[in-house]
């Protein structure tokens, strides 16, 4: 069973998003060992650049504790893939790595240092989504990818 870490900045504030994440976490528990790692959000009153730097450092520290894992950054500048393509990608990654990290930066983004460090940068769309909502969208897609590879009747 593959271990999936969702490394993200901040806590979920809206109940409907928490409920959706909880539902997909429950569904995923049959197929993956899911771990959501919430890192503190930096107050940007000292400047956005400072906030981005500190949040990026926290993400890198979390990644450094997970050696031999494969890291995917959700990034507007990343590569677009279909659900089917990503399902195949995740299947291939899980054959070589027992642990996969999905990273969602804070509302101000991440440093280029992190972009260089990760194994893959994935764009979901050219649209901008709130980072908390993106966590729910990611959870749904992880479940969709697994449902595709396991032939679960979910993806149409």
Language model: regions and residue ranges:
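S-adenosyl-L-methionine/SAH cofactor-binding core of RNA-modifying enzymes
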Residues: 32-33, 38-99
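Short glycine-rich anion-binding loops that position phosphate/pyrophosphate groups of nucleotides
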Residues: 12, 76-79, 106-109
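Conserved RecA-like P-loop NTPase ATPase core
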Residues: 6, 72, 105, 138
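Short glycine-rich, acidic/polar surface loops and turns
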Residues: 100-113
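Loop/turn-to-beta-strand initiation segments
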Residues: 3, 97-102
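Structured adenosyl-cofactor binding patch, chiefly the S-adenosyl-L-methionine
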Residues: 112-156
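Conserved strand-to-helix beginnings and helix N-cap segments that scaffold or border functional pockets
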Residues: 17-21, 49, 83-87, 115, ...
């Amino acid at each position: 069973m593959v271990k999936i870490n969702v490394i993200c900045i901040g806590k979920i504030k809206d109940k409907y998003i928490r409920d959706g994440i909880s539902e997909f976490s429950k569904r995923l528990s049959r197929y993956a060992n899911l771990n959501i790692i919430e890192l503190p959000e930096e107050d940007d009153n000292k400047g956005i650049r400072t906030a981005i730097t500190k949040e990026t450092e926290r993400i890198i520290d979390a990644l450094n504790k997970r050696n031999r894992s494969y890291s995917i950054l959700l990034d507007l500048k990343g590569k677009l893939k279909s659900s089917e393509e990503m399902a195949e990608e995740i299947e291939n990654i899980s054959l070589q790595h027992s642990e996969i990290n999905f990273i969602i930066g804070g509302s101000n983004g991440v440093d280029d240092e992190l972009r260089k460090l990760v194994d893959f940068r994935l764009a979901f769309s050219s649209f901008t989504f709130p980072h908390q909502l993106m966590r729910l969208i990611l959870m749904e897609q992880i479940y969709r990818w697994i449902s595709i590879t396991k032939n679960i009747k979910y993806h149409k």
